[in-house]
């Protein structure tokens, strides 16, 4: 078994780590960064861009650049969260054939799983380059409060990227692993995880290598992106007041505003005031317009006060579900870039009554924990036991549209639970099992995970047939449900792949597309390399021709010039083999030039030697015998 990488697939940034010996190590990407922007762009030529390069072109290509795709993964197009996002995101969100939210880029529809797979494939390749070996196995993190559809969709994204996802692990749990791996004493900790798009809080008991999650809560649609939107609105409103122009209707200006808002928010974590300057943000008949707005930390905090208030509820619920008071929590671990904001830290201090622990890197700690979990699965990390929980209750719809819970939220996973139900009408030949996830009393208020039928029930009065329904949750938090007629032994089961989600066929097709794209990338690189080499060869040859001028014979010059022209023509096309063949021809023809240059240099050297001052006299004087010269005898004198 090769290395198992741990990936934090974040809303804003992603990070990858691996166990090297006994230590987890964050791997750098080809740009040298320890985190990679979770951004994908499709250029006008159809080229796929991921990470920093996609971020750099976002301003000029906002409609074909996707960020924050994690907020859409596993969600229905008709859901309120997607509707909210459609109002603020510059790219087009469309209805998929299965009812999921899809994204349209350059006229083609992509599922959020596919977009996420592009980021994962980039990270996989970066890890392979760093480690110098092929990587197939991975642990991927998700927000603790992700439902089954979102977990399954994340696993599918990994599969499309060519990864064997060994485990889906909750982000706060991963962070606790990174924090507590070397801790020997027992501790009760709270992990407060506020990232780019999601918010989680988990309460754990850790000690002696056991990490037991007692409860988890959160909001999968609350994070840094929401804070940014409020700053964007403020900047746009200020500009409208000043210039009478609403920048929100201009997608390019909106993208510049987004970048400026994010930067200002980050700057205000360390300073109390910043200035947002965006020259040439737009123009009207009177000429170009510039945005210049001062923003103070106090103003930012007043803008986002409602979001700060939303952080309290999940913390209080998590403590209550864990059966703990805030004073019993020994440490509060801050995770996610948004926890750098002083107002967030103050709110955490107020909720838990203590200063939060700032000893971990909030951007990297989740990936490090995932890397450690990879080490556990490989057997490299010993004596670590992870006991996670299911974040939401699971059950089925029963008579009257009620949700009957079989597995309560915060139940330790993996787990299996059965309950016997019966028919609601006389001689009922089949039962429809409607699988639900959530905390509401009525079925309509909860998330539908799937439906299936158990047929062939023998005629009997209502209440007589015994139908055993079994829920099974694996270590990834992914659900399977079965129903069995105890009278006939007939059984029907379903592995929940979400009521929509991607089918196996769609996933396989996307895997093939990804492999095809990798092959295309390889061909593009080969073409680029061949072109670069050919360009360099043409330049060097033309320079040599110019330098030699008339010092080479006409036929050699003609042959070389013809070879140059042929190669130049080939460079206009995309035939790699033709470019390589003509490059070789030009190299062979250029050898004649090299010979001519060598001969010229040699001739110049000889001519130079012949023309040295006094050389002729010296040669004549030394070579010609002189009749007047007499050879001298000598005798050795001994004392």
Curated annotation (Swiss-Prot):
Family: Belongs to the heat shock protein 70 family.
Coiled coil: none
Induction context: By stress conditions e.g. heat shock.
Phosphothreonine: residues carrying this PTM: 198
GO molecular function per UniProt: ATP binding; ATP-dependent protein folding chaperone; unfolded protein binding
Family matches, as SUPFAM superfamilies: Actin-like ATPase domain, Heat shock protein 70kD (HSP70), C-terminal subdomain, Heat shock protein 70kD (HSP70), peptide-binding domain
CDD domains: ASKHA_NBD_HSP70_DnaK-like (cd10234)
Organism: Desulfatibacillum aliphaticivorans
Residue intervals passing through the bilayer: none
InterPro entries per record: ATPase_NBD (IPR043129), Chaperone_DnaK (IPR012725), Heat_shock_70_CS (IPR018181), HSP70_C_sf (IPR029048), HSP70_peptide-bd_sf (IPR029047), Hsp_70_fam (IPR013126)
Bias-annotated ranges (Gly residues): 611-621
Keyword set, alphabetical order: ATP-binding, Chaperone, Nucleotide-binding, Phosphoprotein, Stress response
Stretch list, region Disordered: 599-639
Compositional bias ranges of the Acidic residues kind: 625-639
Protein function: Acts as a chaperone.
Composition bias, Low complexity: 599-610
Protein name: Chaperone protein DnaK
PANTHER family: HEAT SHOCK PROTEIN 70KDA
